[in-house]
């Protein structure tokens, strides 16, 4: 399989979405889901390595950017024996998490993408959405409704 032809068929936004999902996924959950998928052979293009990145922020989300602080990340890249290439960047020092994320990224560019999506990405997306809704429900429960009463004084 020609990796160049395969890579051109993939929508960039879709790939960014699944790579973000894999990076945010809890490592134990991703490892558990990976057990249901046949692990393909691969060679390392870049073994997992730990480094730091500067995290930038903006005041109010729209202001001038500023350096918020540094964060540890692990990155890697690999090529499946069938030619597909996968990349991963994950927060923290978990090399196994980065490897699993890169494997899924590579498999999503190959012929088994629909099976990998059903076995790995869909459960991760469902769990992430459920956690988001639970967090929103907890926040909603603490919401205070303020109101103004008209006083009889002139």
Where in the sequence are the language-model features?
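Charge-rich, low-complexity N-terminal segments
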Residues: 1-37
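Short capping/connector residues at structural and topological boundaries
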Residues: 71-73, 95, 149-151
